[in-house]
């Protein structure tokens, strides 16, 4: 099971990724984790990547793909792998294709932006314990107060509506075109000897268990 998980920030990809990893016994490939590990280990690619990071520059796609190919050779990838948050752009998707990285499924978790804004901007956090609430879906017993300590809850900057909207704008511009890219490739079929992944789209609305059932149905 070799899979790319697509969906906007706040669509619930992280939760479903955990279910997929457990069911199929595959690792989640995070480019951020890979970069940190390569830099820490001082591998040739890690040293090269660190030079970009130290200058505050984006690590080039060619380097990221090199790290991906190294990571996929490891034993835990024998049964497959799950990409979450990569590729983010058409250029990265093209680079993956050119590098011959095989993918069986591209799964999109679709949630309307209005729902994502409500989900994320309604979150409230108790800073000391990390306990989280939601003003609509999981409110505290007393508005604005932690259930256990009675201390005030905060809204993290990441959860503020204007921040959420900005992240969704970036997704719309950069990552959403991948949905068309993979949908078109699935229609065309094999290219450069690489089998096109099957493209599946499911609704990310409803209870977590309902969404999980949809995910597993889509991956049959």
Curated annotation (Swiss-Prot):
Residues 124-150 are annotated as: Disordered. Residues 30-59 are annotated as: NMP. ATP binds at residues 10-15, 123, 132-133, 206. GO terms for molecular function: adenylate kinase activity; ATP binding. NCBIfam families: adk, PRK00279.1-1, PRK00279.1-2, PRK00279.1-3, PRK14527.1. Catalyzes the reversible transfer of the terminal phosphate group between ATP and AMP. Plays an important role in cellular energy homeostasis and in adenine nucleotide metabolism. Monomer. This is Adenylate kinase. It comes from Burkholderia thailandensis (strain ATCC 700388 / DSM 13276 / CCUG 48851 / CIP 106301 / E264).
